[in-house]
């Protein structure tokens, strides 16, 4: 979501929960890659820009609670979990589904699961 993997040099990243750096129309789903002006100074309240095609607000292309995950990134993430040599779980509560099932998919495929978190999660029992 925050593009930290790309900034670190990763090249095969699947944004299962979307990205804050790509924009879409909240209604017609028109893409607005890198075309939305974002204020560079502190803003206390601002109206989102309107889609010129349907008038609905333009929003970050992220998955909000209750929305479906994007199909292609999800499918690629499942394949990666099935084929990985080791699966790292870092900084998550491991309770938001369906993404929380990925460590279990990796474990069932024979990969060791390593969890790095300040507290135990529902998936801690899978960890080596």
Residue ranges of model-derived segments:
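Conserved catalytic alpha/beta core of Sir2/sirtuin-type deacylases, generalized to analogous enzyme cores
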Residues: 1-127
